[in-house]
Amino acid sequence: MIVKATEEEIQEIRTKSADALFEGTMKQFHPSAERVNELVGSALEKGCYYLVSRQENKLAGWVLAGPSADFFSKEEIGFIYELYVLPEYRGQGLAKPLMQKAIDELSIKGYPEIRLSVHAGNFAQHVYRELGFIDKQISMSLQVVKRP
């Protein structure tokens, strides 16, 4: 069953979000608890919400979804900020239903488009593509060597 997170579940998610972000960014970003609280707090304040999957009354995974705006046009769009399934529940087919519930809710709210960002090499890309997401833009990076 996928439902909106309770306050208690949101607090539990906050304790696990640093690890989720570390994994989701392909181990490039490991935020402090303070930074996690800033990120989550900011998202929740602007109208985002968590949907959770429970297995035997335990938190198994979550998706964070809500409003965003296109950088160029400022058009309001739906956005999926985070998808995470706890390691002990992986391989049980939880990611796709979490995503579908978020897509359904954002669609009902009338957003003309739903976007997400994903790091290159992230295993979840195949789930996103199976749900119909396509590459829209590519973010590129160049490591610069600091000179003395």
List the predicted regions and their residue ranges.
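A conserved beta-turn-beta hairpin within the catalytic core of GNAT-like acetyltransferases
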Residues: S68-I80, R90, K136
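Conserved GNAT acetyl-CoA-binding A-motif
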Residues: L106-S117
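Conserved active-site alpha-helix within GNAT-family acetyltransferase domains
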Residues: K96, A120-I138, L142
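Conserved GNAT-fold acetyl-CoA-binding loop/helix
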Residues: A18-L39
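Conserved beta-strand in the GNAT
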Residues: V52, K58-P67, F79, Y84
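A short beta-loop-alpha structural element at the N-terminal edge
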Residues: M1-T15
